[in-house]
């Protein structure tokens, strides 16, 4: 019995440990700064000032167009969601059966207890009702800014950007990560773009330390909030 309890406790601990998301770690290679690509040497040097791959319109502003350039993304994210459901189900049924003969013969209805005659009549009735009501609401807001680098330039001119910012505070670290696609036309003259203009955006705001741990429920509370809890 003791062995069974130990195995059950270890299994439950392993399952609960698997439900805990790993804390973010710095220096993720995917979000590492992308350095500018070294241009290939030209086959012949004609002495011209113009170099292929570094052309720019004389009437346009200087914007980030090449791999390794820096872009500042202004975070302005607000989401509000609400959902409600209301359902009700009622079912009532009844039936009665009366028999005067059984296989053509009239049965003896004398009650041996002497408390009225017996009968073959039968009846039933049922009533069932179910009612449910649920509501959910969620609101999120994220403002700030993060400076990232151009990771790639697609053939159609769309710019792929990504980067991260770590801020070390007294009681832990704060992390902001973003990755997505930006149109060159949406970049302002000061190389800034709003996060609402970032397509396929992947924005992460997280942290480590005592403040982040205080917002997480304990392992015992997670058991009652997990699908393993049968009630």
From Swiss-Prot:
Q: Keyword Transmembrane helix on this protein?
A: no
**Pfam families named among the record's database cross-references:** FlgH
> Which residue(s) hold a covalent lipid per the annotation (N-palmitoyl cysteine)?
19
Check the UniProt entry and state the signal peptide residues, or none. 1-18
GO molecular function annotation: cytoskeletal motor activity
- Annotated GO biological process: bacterial-type flagellum-dependent cell motility
Membrane topology for this entry?
Lipid-anchor
Cross-referenced InterPro entries: Flag_Lring (IPR000527)
Does this UniProt record's set of keywords contain Ribonucleoprotein? Answer: no
Q: What does this protein do?
A: Assembles around the rod to form the L-ring and probably protects the motor/basal body from shearing forces during rotation.
- Protein family (similarity comment): Belongs to the FlgH family.
Name of this chain's protein: Flagellar L-ring protein
From which organism does this entry originate? Pseudomonas fluorescens (strain ATCC BAA-477 / NRRL B-23932 / Pf-5)
């Amino acid at each position: 019995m003791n062995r069974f309890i130990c195995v059950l406790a270890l299994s439950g601990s392993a399952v609960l440990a698997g439900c805990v998301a790993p804390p973010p770690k710095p220096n993720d290679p995917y979000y590492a700064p992308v350095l500018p690509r070294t241009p290939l040497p030209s086959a012949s040097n004609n002495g011209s000032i113009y170099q292929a791959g570094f052309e720019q319109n004389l009437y346009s502003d200087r914007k980030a167009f090449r791999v390794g350039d820096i872009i500042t993304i202004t975070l302005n994210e607000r989401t509000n969601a609400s959902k409600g459901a209301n359902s009700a189900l009622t079912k009532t049924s009844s039936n009665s059966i009366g028999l005067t003969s059984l296989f053509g013969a009239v049965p003896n209805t004398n009650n041996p207890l002497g408390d009225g005659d017996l009968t073959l009549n039968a009846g039933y009735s049922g009533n069932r009702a179910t009612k449910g009501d649920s509501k959910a609401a969620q609101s999120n807001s994220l403002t700030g800014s993060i400076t990232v680098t151009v990771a790639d330039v697609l053939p159609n001119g769309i710019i792929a950007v990504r980067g991260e910012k770590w801020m070390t505070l007294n009681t832990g670290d704060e992390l902001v990560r973003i990755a997505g696609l930006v149109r060159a036309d949406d970049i302002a003259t000061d190389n800034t773009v709003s996060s609402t203009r970032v397509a396929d955006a992947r924005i992460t705001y997280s942290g480590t330390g005592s403040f982040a741990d205080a917002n997480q429920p304990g392992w015992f509370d997670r058991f009652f909030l997990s699908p393993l809890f049968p009630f």
